[in-house]
């Protein structure tokens, strides 16, 4: 999909999380091609940068540029025993309330309950120790859309 992003951020391979639009976007003529194409709280990766700069008062450099984006792969620590490369599943967040050093991997931004995911890579056992005693595997997930 195509969206607009600040010129200084428009680099192939960059990733970002879309947290939603700001008030200034509501009456902008580029709203449909900029923020309306993105889903709030999702992580995206820039796969191509286009030409054709536009003015935008929201970005620091006052310029946006069109980019092609896809949803980013997500790194997840999971205690599931039935996960293998190529398997698909509906994501359900872990039953854990610990705020530990691995929290961002157990509850990664861009992934919400009910997402249909595919395991792209199972990196094996996570070397760190879970405070809840879970045996964790490090996974790279893609999305089934």
From Swiss-Prot:
This is UPF0179 protein Msm_0285. Pfam families: UPF0179. The lineage of its organism: Archaea, Methanobacteriati, Methanobacteriota, Methanomada group, Methanobacteria. Belongs to the UPF0179 family. InterPro entries: UPF0179 (IPR005369). It comes from Methanobrevibacter smithii (strain ATCC 35061 / DSM 861 / OCM 144 / PS).
